[in-house]
Amino acid sequence: MATALSEEELDNEDYYSLLNVRREASSEELKAAYRRLCMLYHPDKHRDPELKSQAERLFNLVHQAYEVLSDPQTRAIYDIYGKRGLEMEGWEVVERRRTPAEIREEFERLQREREERRLQQRTNPKGTISVGVDATDLFDRYDEEYEDVSGSSFPQIEINKMHISQSIEAPLTATDTAILSGSLSTQNGNGGGSINFALRRVTSAKGWGELEFGAGDLQGPLFGLKLFRNLTPRCFVTTNCALQFSSRGIRPGLTTVLARNLDKNTVGYLQWRWGIQSAMNTSIVRDTKTSHFTVALQLGIPHSFALISYQHKFQDDDQTRVKGSLKAGFFGTVVEYGAERKISRHSVLGAAVSIGVPQGVSLKVKLNRASQTYFFPIHLTDQLLPSAVFYATMGPLVVYFAMHRLIIKPYLRAQKEKELEKQRESAATDVLQKKQEAESAVRLMQESVRRIIEAEESRMGLIIVNAWYGKFVNDKSRKSEKVKVIDVTVPLQCLVKDSKLILTEASKAGLPGFYDPCVGEEKNLKVLYQFRGVLHQVMVLDSEALRIPKQSHRIDTDG
């Protein structure tokens, strides 16, 4: 199966693989590997001008790898950020003998400085589109009572409300951000809109403030002030003051939230709202890798309620989540359950069924696409009908699995193949260069390999008969796929020492004489070797460690 191709796959040399050492290798192991490769690639050992030039290039690459890994600071940078981290401007002013954590902080600081140069080009658009659908005619029919009324025999499904909101952010400086937002709403033929402008300033690492001005056709001007402050490392407070101007006068409002981390996964909130819909609310939220739990209690005018909800997070590639909640108060009782799942890299689709008294039964469908949200609340019935609950539950499941199998999955597969092919084309030049370097390395190894084979044959030791690296197709259903393997017999024989061959847990593409023949796809290494005059065979994954010879690799010829 093809895998996504990362930029690191193309641009970063794997220095550990090049030296064939573990990522935890000691300085002695690094030095031994460096000396062995220096003896192989030193330019002075080759008289032919072309071979001498190739040896010089490979020798410099090996020397660069050793220089990086033998220095604790550059090795820490390379381990965390790869080769690109070493190329980041500003490391020359960093003190030596820093810990990996300090180096990580320094790298992030340098990244922030680079990002500040592009602040003016940044924006953070967010949008919501909500479309309310009245589908009660599907279940609440009055045919028997109104038989004389002429009309269509088909249920009447209509859109009874809509809401659209959009906001963008424009960073002015490293601490100031302007926010412009607007919204439009309509319900049963009546609508209105508003526009808001806010200016946010980060005053320190502990807090920020925001001024907001707004106006709309249904409500008068709005003036607001928001403040955020970290009181302690585990406690923060937010305050929102608002003044709503209208023909009836000024309506003030104040909302204050005090929050405290009870432990690393649990936060407690205490909220007081005065003025517009006064209320006191307290809640506890626990969020872990596999679950999200909320319990809340609100006392207020006009709504008082108790809420408990739970969400389970599955640890799969699609980030599936199932949730359920119970909410009871003076307005009635509502039970809600649903699920959501990632359908593409930037899209999450979810559906929930809401069953309540006196609200009835509703189906809520939500699609999150990047920073855009599309919400469709569908009101099915005002009564508690089992048929409505059944169709609201099973309908979305049937539609989802049908769409996923017939539309989404084939589309994503085609997109993935298209992206992979595009990446292969862009990497073609790099692959050609790697191939030429590998062929040059193999030519430089010939004399050393001849001596190694003579030594191994004299003591009935380890002889690499054949070795292949790349994509192997064994499944009959995939025979049409092209086999992409390269012969790596010589490079592996060159790594044999004292009748042993040891490869570390790293991609074999970085080994001397190797290159990646199928960028972005799964690869294996297959080795046929002879030890003590007996044939052995083994196949390992690209990033799997290998030690030979082993008795388990022996080819049984008795049968």
From Swiss-Prot:
Its main location: mitochondrion. GO terms for cellular component: MICOS complex; nuclear speck; SAM complex. Residues 14-82 form the J domain. The modification Phosphoserine is found at S204. InterPro entries: DnaJ-like_C11_C, DnaJ_domain, DnaJ_domain_CS, DNAJC11-like_beta-barrel, J_dom_sf, Mito_inner_membrane_organizer. The keyword Nucleus does not apply. PROSITE patterns: DNAJ_1, DNAJ_2. It is found in: Mitochondrion; Mitochondrion outer membrane. The modification N-acetylalanine is found at A2. One of its GO terms (biological process) is cristae formation. The keyword Zinc does not apply. It comes from the Eukaryota. Residues 417-457 form a coiled coil. Belongs to the DNAJC11 family. Required for mitochondrial inner membrane organization. Seems to function through its association with the MICOS complex and the mitochondrial outer membrane sorting assembly machinery (SAM) complex. This is DnaJ homolog subfamily C member 11. It comes from Pongo abelii (Sumatran orangutan). The lineage of its organism: Eukaryota, Metazoa, Chordata, Craniata, Vertebrata.
